């Protein structure tokens, strides 16, 4: 994956770096009635079926995947069954820092499936991979309010330092990479209204439950699908499970990427009219 890596001499009192990106966003909508020939690099598909440090595919992950997909025959059936399983068994936990850690084995073993998008969509991706369905997390950033009236599915463009969001994709024969986001279903159920919605058939949740199986709203920018990263020049040992927040270190150690005001980073977006 591509990234910006900057280093500053110890004599620089107030190091500063600014990055400007110009992107075009679009809604992703799948037409389930239309099938087409789709070719993908076998290396990409193998990567989307592989285990990572926090997404093992054996043990409790495989057992859970088998339970969730019991009776499902096609990859579409498996993806739909896992999507519904995640919504039925997991929940959004507002107290989770950042977007979560994505440690699905620990979550499944503990029985506590509460977390945020990097946890909840990671469960979806891990169960899909364990079922033989290529899937991947897509790490990115919301950049604008939702056009569909859901406050929890949008962001304040002027201040995006807490707008990071992970989505998911599955590769399905006849359709290619298809958008998914069970984590946002659970976010709406937990936070869109004062009461915690427990039933995805609720009038507020039902459109999101149906809409986010195969679709994404284009108020979001995807950065990468990488796992287990070795960042250049990183002093702290080990890998980064995913890359969605700015990372920084100095002689005293690593900065807290989930505390932008202490780290001192800001993110903003401006819509450019065509």
Walk through the language-model features, giving the residues of each:
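A surface-exposed beta-strand-loop module
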Residues: 1-20
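Low-complexity, Gly/Ser/Thr/Pro-rich intrinsically disordered linker/tail segments
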Residues: 207-274
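Short alpha-helical interface elements
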Residues: 44, 107-111, 149-153, 193, ...
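Secondary-structure boundary elements
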Residues: 15-17, 21-34, 39-115, 125-126, ...
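Generic alpha-helical propensity signal that fires on short helical segments
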Residues: 33-43, 100, 104, 151-155, ...
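Non-catalytic surface loops within mature trypsin-like serine protease
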Residues: 10, 23-27, 172
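Hydrophobic/aromatic-rich core segments of domains that either
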Residues: 122-235
